[in-house]
Amino acid sequence: MVTPKFRRVILKLSGEALAGQKGYGIDPEVVYSIASQIKDVLEHRVQLAIVVGGGNIWRGISGSTKGMDRATADYMGMLATVINSLALQDALEKIEVDTRVQTSFEMRAVAETYIRRRAIRHMEKGRVVIFAAGTGNPYFSTDTTAALRAAEVEAEIILMAKQVDGVYDADPLKHPGAKRFDELTYIDVLNRGLQVMDSTAVSLCMDNKIPLLVFDLNTEGNIKRAILGERIGTFVGGDLNG
C-alpha cells in the first residue's frame, strides 16, 4: 500500500459539487460518486474531515443583496450545509463508511454538536467527520469554517475540491488563454485577489501555516491523488522558495 503524504486532512466541498449538472439541489448519483472516492482514500488510513458548503440550496450573501437581513440569510445558509452534510453522511454509510456529522450549534435530533476533542477522537478511530452549520456565526463563509476547523483539529492540509483543475489568473471558462498556477503563496492569493477562498479564510490559513491544494473534483480519483502527494492542481503555502 502506498503511504499517503498527509495523515489528517480537511476536504472542502462546495455545495454545488453535490448538485451535479443541474447546478442546484442534490444529485444522489453525484453524492454517491464522491462518497466512493472518499471510501477509497480511507483504505490508506488517512484521517479525514469534511466541510461542505450550501450554495446548491441557499447563499446567504445572495439573500442579503435582495433586502433580507444578512444574519438571517447566513443562518439559512448554515441550515443548507446541514442538509448537504446529512446527504453525504447517508451516502457514506450506505457503503459502510462510519460517519459523524457535527454541527456548530445544537441540533441533537440529527447530529452531534461540535466538540473539538470528540471530532479528533472520531478521526483517530477511522470515522469520517462532517463539520456542518459553518462556524455557527453569520458573516463567516464555509471556507473560513474549513480553515478554522483545520487549525483546531491540527489538519496538515485543506483539500479544496473545485469544478476547475486549479487556480487561474482569470476565469478559464470566460478566458481560454488564462494561465494556471502550479504553486502560489498566501500573499500571492491575497494580493492578486485570486478566487481560492475568501481573504478571511486565506489569512487564517497563513497565520496557522495550513497549506491548501486546489484541484478538480470532477476527475475520478483526484481526492486520492491529492492525499498521496501527486502533483495535481495548485498548491498554496508559505515561502515556496524556502
From Swiss-Prot:
**Known Pfam families for this protein?**
AA_kinase (PF00696)
Task: Please name the top-level EC class of this enzyme.
Answer: transferase
Family of the protein in this entry: Belongs to the UMP kinase family.
Quaternary structure, per UniProt, is: Homohexamer.
One GO biological process term: UDP biosynthetic process
Q: Which CDD domains match?
A: AAK_UMPK-PyrH-Ec
| Signal sequence region | none
- GO MF term set: ATP binding; UMP kinase activity
Q: Which GO terms describe its cellular component?
A: cytoplasm
Swiss-Prot/TrEMBL keywords: Allosteric enzyme, ATP-binding, Cytoplasm, Kinase, Nucleotide-binding, Pyrimidine biosynthesis, Transferase
Write down the chemical reaction(s) this protein catalyses. UMP + ATP = UDP + ADP
Please name the Gene3D superfamilies in this protein's record. Answer: Acetylglutamate kinase-like
The protein's job, in short, is: Catalyzes the reversible phosphorylation of UMP to UDP.
State what inhibits or activates this protein. Answer: Allosterically activated by GTP. Inhibited by UTP.
Q: Where does ATP bind?
A: 12-15, 55, 59, 163, 168, 171
The residues that hold UMP are 54, 74, 135-142
Organism, per UniProt? Desulforamulus reducens (strain ATCC BAA-1160 / DSM 100696 / MI-1)
Pathways per UniProt = Pyrimidine metabolism; CTP biosynthesis via de novo pathway; UDP from UMP (UMPK route): step 1/1
Transmembrane regions: none
Q: Where in the cell is it found?
A: Cytoplasm
Instruction: Write down what this protein is called.
Output: Uridylate kinase
Keyword Kinase tagged: yes
The cross-references to InterPro entries, in alphabetical order and at most eight, read: AceGlu_kinase-like_sf, Asp/Glu/Uridylate_kinase, Uridylate_kinase, Uridylate_kinase_bac
- Give the start-end ranges of region Involved in allosteric activation by GTP: 20-25
What's the Enzyme Commission number for this chain?
Answer: 2.7.4.22
Principal localisation: cytoplasm
